Amino acid sequence: MKIFRIGAAAVLLLAALLAAQAPAERTVVIDPGHGGLETGAKGRFGNLEKDITLAISLKLKALIEKDMGFEVVLTRDRDVDVPMEARSAVANNHKAALFISIHANGAVQKKAAGSETFFLSLNATDEETRRLAYLENNSTELQTRVDPSADNDLMMILWDMAQNAYIKQSSRLAELVQGELDAMLGTRNRGIKQAPFKVLTGVACPAILVEAAFISNPDEEQKLASDTFQTKVAEAIYRGLARYLKAGQ
């Protein structure tokens, strides 16, 4: 008889899958990426990802609360560190209907540009996506990485269950949000992709991660730092969400 050792990550995934049995409330959880000592990516002009993601998230929260009648919960509403496991726990504790994580992209190549939207998968769409997920998952030494290649049968079973539970809804939400980003921002459309982002694991509802633009690209950094562009990003995500809800996904 095989005996499984249940680690913290496995417990988190199992709890999320059990929480999925409960009916979803009219709550949307917005996750402003990074925060506190974990600044995220930094642009040439000194702008920090953590500040941009919070600004966009606050604008999105206001739009949803004003026009949709949903309760909106932020994983952070100020400049503080929030462990990745705690972010997904916020969604599950509030029985969230949707989870949206907001980020600003970064790359070694300063010419890299555009917007893209992700949903969870054990396997990354391509090598660039795998690299991005690795960097996000290892953004601080205080947080551990979920290693899909680990020889742990229980973790693999839970990973499969977690990624399949809401994959159709997450894929559709990502598609609609990305379509609105493309229509409103004028940035390169990098499409929708799948990646093993740790922040999306263990969330017991449809979940996406939005990379609004590249803060490592000086031109896009200036856009990301502007109130006008931040508002457009929030409005694009809002419109994609509205289309998703209207379709009764």
Where in the sequence are the language-model features?
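A generic, residue-level signal for flexible/boundary positions that often mark functional hotspots
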Residues: 12, 76-78, 114, 126, ...
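Hydrophobic h-region of N-terminal signal peptides that target proteins for export
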Residues: 11-20
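Bacterial N-terminal signal peptides that target proteins for export
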Residues: 1-10
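Active-site-adjacent mobile loop/cap segments within catalytic or ligand-binding domains
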Residues: 40, 158-249
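Catalytic-core regions of hydrolytic enzymes
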Residues: 21-154, 163-175, 179
